[in-house]
Amino acid sequence: MLLPFLFLPSLILAEVADYGTPPKGINPTLYSVDDKVIQLDESTFNETIFCTRSDCPSYLVEFYSDWCGHCRSFAPLYKQLAKDINSWNNVVRIGAMNCADSVNAATCRANGVAYFPYIKYFPRNSSDPTTGTLLRAFRTLSEMRDQVTKHVMDDYSVNRFEDWPNFDFLKDMTTFSELWEEVGANETAEHIAIVFENHPSSLTGAQLLMDLLPYNDRLYSRRALKNHPLVEALHLTDFPSLVIFKKGDRVPVVQAELRRLLFNEVEQFLHEEKEEVDPTIQFTARKNASEECINEPEKCKARYYVSEVDMLKAIRYAILRETARTGAPLSGSNLTALHGFLSSLHDHLPTVTFHGDEEQTLNRSSAAVTVFARMRDWLEEKGALASDNDSIVISVDDFQKEFLLAEENAGNPFPITIEWDHCKGSTRQMRGYSCGLWTTFHALSVTAYRQKENETDSSPLPLLTSIRSWVEHFFGCLHCRDHFLRMTTKTFPMEIEAKKFEDVFLYLWKAHNVVNARLKGRDTEDPMFLKYQFPARFLCSNCTASDESTIKPFLINYYSDIKPYTAPVEKANGNK
């Protein structure tokens, strides 16, 4: 049997990526060839980032997943950062890699990508992933720019690259001839710019030096502190200030406070005539979608259903890719979490769909359940249930290989190349995996209830806690994970809110609506699938959040009426 290329040595010829280079892979990306973001893939990462030439830049790389809500929210800021510091590209460049694409799995794992977005700064002439430094995904452009600046300056302080700006503060001098000696290193420059700063920790001067890099042949730039002798000679009182001298002159050709320069720019903007933006143009897609669902509820209703394709696609990605993302072994709490989630999938994944009085077997899901059973048993054979399973170490490579064998023996029940169904977004960057995962959670909870609704002593917590544990240890979107854990443990704790067995599905319904309320109106909201409080009126006209007696039967019917994945299951291979 041939295993997928995931486990074969890479035979891809190495290439160097540049602005406008389209990445290899099949997944949608959050960046385009028009952005000032260099898009990396498995074939270009090493040659680009681990460049050995003397003129190589350093790199800032975002490892992201196209399905990750936080990554989608962060992408506009990252594009803005790339555009803002594009003039620094001889010093540092901005790159990105989509870890959701299987072609990039090995590189993302080698870089220890524990969550998304995961940002690393690679100094010039980095040699391997360990040379990268983890950065934070700040919320503002200034914070991101300052963070990059600090790492560039740290890089310079160690290596002092001659073709980078000289970030050292100008030494004290008593004559202008000493100043011109500073320019002598750059014989073509006819001017010298000096940024006088208030404090050694200020980053303004360093950023301006890199902003001026494109003019380096005409303008030599340095920075100085407010106690420099030139400050008194030039009568400077406000900082930061910019002074530009022509070579050989003693009187500056430009002298201005940066605050005044910025104010003048704002003033010019305010006095310019701007085209009036028609407010009716804004948010057109969202408005149209909302009006459509009010005026034509049946048309909107047809877009909402539970799909076996969506669930199986999401489950396969969750089990095969998310568990192995970092390359960290399965041991202790994460091993327990994976075993618990596989057990829940085996016990509660719906294998039958109910449409009215009609009942139909979901053949693909039935086959998938055998995969979950095999993987659960395999983990138990390895010691997952041992009281001291911290001492058990299972490599994720071995786990993936076993999963692929189990999948093949079950007739390959999981859709891989098939598109998302109900979870297909209005663009390729919308919905997808996160939608499929939520759908799976809801369907598991409704099936669990149907299986035991007459058992009065059943607890809703085993399934709910298995879902939470899997999210805690394996879900890649850091922001989403943190919100989910905070909600389910603090703001809406499942141990307190889920008391009756019917809460096994009612709790998840309420929790999902909390998430929808938080995300409503954001850029990540698909205009064709607005973040309604579920169910929307066009799905259930008499449902209200305060009346669980109407919500309960609706949810049971909705998550039991599953659109089957109709492609036939391959003949199962009985060989282990």
Map each language-model feature to its residues.
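A short, hydrophobic beta-strand/beta-hairpin element that forms part of a small beta-sheet core
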Residues: 59, 78, 114-134, 232-260, ...
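Local sequence-structure signature of Cys/Sec-based thiol-disulfide redox active-site neighborhoods
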Residues: 25, 44-85, 175-211, 460, ...
